[in-house]
C-alpha cells in the first residue's frame, strides 16, 4: 500500500541523504598510524584550500523579512540565496553554501560565524516589500574585526529585483578586489510574478522542506507564465520526485511521474545543455529508474566537468561512489563539498562510513564527532565504529544514547550483546525486533542473523526486505550490497544470484567510476 511505498521511498532518500552502513570487520584491521597520517594530510589539504583564497571568502546569511505582515520570508531568503549563487560563480571567491550559512538565522555573533565557517566576510541584510516596491538593505561585514565595510539601501520597483541582486554581488566582487574578465555573473531573468511563484516553491522545498505538492503547483503556474525559466524547470523535477510512486493521485504513478520528470529535464537541457543540475538529474534518473549505471556515470561526470563546485552534484557523486565500492572517491567528494559546506552532516556521515570500510577507525570517529556537533543523533553510527573496532562495551554505551529509536536500538543491542557473549540478552533483543513490521526492521533482522551466522534466516529476512517488483529495487539493493553486517552472506550462492538478478555484479560495478575533476 501507500504506507509501505512511502517507507521504501523514505529509506532510499535517507540513503541518498545521509549514507548507509559500511565496513567489513572480517577483512580490514584498524590502521591507527595510517588514520592519524591521513587525518593530518586532510587538515593540510583543507588548510591549503582555504588559504589559497586568502581573505576572499564570504558567507551570505539569510536576509530578514521586514515586511509589515511578516509573510515575505520566501522573498528575503530567496534574495539572499540568489546573491549567494551569483557569488558562487566567481571562481576566485570561496562562498559558503546555503545549507551551512542559513543555519545562522536571526541575531548572530559575526566573529563566531566567521570562525565556525572560516570566512573573512559576511553579508547580511533585510527585505521589505510593499505593493510593487521593495527595499533591500545589504551590509558587508569584515567578519574578523566585526566591522562594517559598507551598508546600503536599494529602493526599487519589484521589477528591478534582479538588478538589485546583480548590483550587490558586483559590489562585493569589486570591494574584494577580484578582477573579472567579463561583466560578472547575472541573475536568470523572468517577470516578477514568475520569480515570486518560483521563490515560494523554492522556500517550501529547500528551506521549510514541506508541501512538495503545493510547491509543484506553484512551479506549474510559474512555467505557464515562462516556460523557459530554467530554475523552475530544475526545481520542479525534485517536487515531482517526492510523490512519484507514493501518491493516490494518478499524476504520480511511476510511469507518469518518470515521464514528467524526464520531460522537464529535457526542456532544461534544451535551454542550457551544460547545466550541471539538469545533467545530474538525467543521470540519476537513468540509475534510479533504469539501472543504467553507465549513463548515470556519463552524465554525472559531465555535470562535474561543467561545475565541479555544484554542491548537489558533489553529494550525488559522494553517495554513489561509496555505493559502487569506490570508497576513497566517496571521501574525496565529501571533502570537496565540506570545503564550502562545512556543516554538511550528510557529508560527514558518509565520510565516517567510508573511513570505516577502509579500516581507518580513528578517522571515522573524528568524522563522527564532527558530525554530532552539527546534527542530532549519530550514536548508533558511532557505536558501530566501536563495535567494528572490537570494543563492544563502548559500542553498547553509544547505542544506549539513542534508545528512543526502537529498530536501530534493538538491532544494535543484539549485535553488541552477541560480541559480549550475553546470548540471552541478544535473543531478547532479537525477539522484540522480530515483532516490528517495517522494512527497516526486516533489514535489521537480516543484519543481525547474518552477523551471528544464521545465514538461512538472514536470507529469509532479506527476502522480506527486498522487493524486485518495486521500481526503486536497485537503489535499495545497492545499499544492501555495501552493508557490512551482511558479510557472512557473501560466500553463499544466493548472494551471487541476487547480484546477477539485479545486474549489479562486482565486475560491472568495477567499470563504473565518477571522476573528481582536476
Labelled PLM ranges:
Residues 1-10:
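Membrane-interfacial entry segments at the cytosolic side of transmembrane helices
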Residues 10, 14-369, 373-374, 379-386, ...:
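Acidic, proline/glycine-rich low-complexity intrinsically disordered segments
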Residues 230-231, 276-277, 310-312, 343-348, ...:
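Boundary/linker segments of alpha-helical solenoid repeat arrays
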Residues 237-239, 353, 411-423, 475-493:
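TPR/TPR-like alpha-solenoid helical repeat scaffolds
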Residues 304-306, 336-343, 369-376, 400-407, ...:
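Solenoid-like repeat scaffolds
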Residues 362, 378, 383-459, 463:
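Helix-coil-helix junctions within alpha-helical repeat/solenoid scaffolds
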Residues 446, 450-454, 460, 465, ...:
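C-terminal accessory segments
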Residues 480-518:
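Terminal, low-structured helical/coil segments at or just beyond the last alpha-helical repeat
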Amino acid at each position: 500500500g501507500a504506507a509501505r511505498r512511502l517507507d521504501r521511498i523514505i529509506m532510499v532518500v535517507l540513503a541518498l541523504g545521509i549514507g548507509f552502513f559500511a565496513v567489513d570487520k572480517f577483512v580490514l584491521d584498524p590502521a591507527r598510524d595510517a588514520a592519524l597520517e591521513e587525518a593530518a594530510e586532510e587538515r593540510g589539504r583543507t588548510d591549503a584550500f582555504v588559504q589559497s583564497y586568502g581573505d576572499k571568502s564570504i558567507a551570505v546569511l539569510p536576509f530578514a523579512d521586514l515586511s509589515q505582515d511578516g509573510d515575505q520570508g520566501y522573498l528575503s531568503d530567496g534574495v539572499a540565496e540568489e546573491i549567494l549563487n551569483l557569488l558562487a560563480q566567481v571562481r576566485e571567491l570561496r562562498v559558503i553554501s546555503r545549507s551551512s550559512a542559513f543555519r545562522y538565522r536571526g541575531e548572530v555573533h559575526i566573529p563566531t560565524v566567521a570562525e565556525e565557517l572560516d570566512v573573512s566576510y559576511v553579508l547580511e541584510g533585510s527585505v521589505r516589500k510593499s505593493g510593487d516596491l521593495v527595499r533591500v538593505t545589504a551590509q558587508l561585514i569584515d567578519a574578523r574585526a566585526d566591522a562594517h565595510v559598507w551598508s546600503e539601501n536599494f529602493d526599487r520597483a519589484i521589477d528591478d529585483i534582479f538588478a538589485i541582486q546583480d548590483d550587490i554581488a558586483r559590489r562585493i566582487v569589486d570591494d574584494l578586489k577580484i578582477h573579472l574578465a567579463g561583466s560578472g555573473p547575472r541573475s536568470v531573468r523572468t517577470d516578477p510574478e514568475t520569480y515570486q511563484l518560483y521563490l515560494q516553491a523554492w522556500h517550501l522545498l529547500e528551506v521549510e522542506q514541506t508541501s512538495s505538492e503545493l510547491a509543484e503547483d506553484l512551479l506549474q503556474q510559474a512555467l505557464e507564465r515562462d516556460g523557459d525559466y530554467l530554475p523552475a524547470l530544475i526545481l520542479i523535477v525534485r517536487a515531482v520526485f517526492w510523490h512519484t510512486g507514493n501518491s493516490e493521485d494518478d499524476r504520480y504513478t511511476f510511469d507518469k511521474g518518470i515521464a514528467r520528470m524526464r520531460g522537464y529535464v529535457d526542456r532544461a537541457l534544451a535551454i542550457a545543455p551544460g547545466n550541471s543540475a539538469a545533467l545530474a538529474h538525467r543521470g540519476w534518473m537513468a540509475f534510479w529508474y533504469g539501472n543504467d549505471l553507465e549513463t548515470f556515470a556519463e552524465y554525472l561526470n559531465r555535470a562535474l566537468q561543467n561545475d565541479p563546485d555544484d554542491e548537489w552534484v558533489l553529494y550525488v557523486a559522494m553517495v554513489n561512489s561509496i555505493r559502487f565500492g569506490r570508497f576513497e572517491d566517496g571521501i574525496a567528494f565529501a571533502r570537496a563539498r565540506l570545503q564550502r559546506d562545512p556543516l554538511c552532516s550528510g557529508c560527514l556521515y558518509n565520510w565516517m562510513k567510508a573511513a570505516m570500510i577502509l579500516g581507518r577507525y580513528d578517522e571515522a570517529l573524528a568524522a563522527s564527532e564532527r558530525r554530532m556537533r552539527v546534527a542530532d543523533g549519530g550514536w548508533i553510527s558511532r557505536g558501530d565504529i566501536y563495535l567494528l573496532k572490537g570494543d563492544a562495551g563502548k559500542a553498547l554505551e553509544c547505542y544506549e544514547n539513542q534508545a528512543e529509536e526502537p529498530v536501530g536500538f534493538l538491532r544494535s543491542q543484539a549485535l553488541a550483546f552477541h560480541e559480549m557473549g550475553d546470548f540471552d540478552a541478544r535473543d531478547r533483543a532479537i525477539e522484540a525486533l522480530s515483532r516490528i513490521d517495517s522494512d527497516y526492521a526486516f533489514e535489521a533482522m537480516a543484519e543481525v542473523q547474518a552477523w551471528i551466522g544464521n545465514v538461512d534466516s538472514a536470507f529469509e529476512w532479506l527476502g522480506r526486505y527486498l522487493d524486485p517488483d518495486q521500481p526503486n529495487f536497485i537503489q535499495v539493493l545497492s545499499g544492501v550490497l555495501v552493508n557490512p553486517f551482511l558479510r557472512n552472506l557473501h560466500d553463499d550462492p544466493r548472494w551471487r544470484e541476487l547480484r546477477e538478478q539485479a545486474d549489479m555484479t562486482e565486475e560491472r560495478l568495477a567499470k563504473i567510476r565518477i571522476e573528481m575533476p582536476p
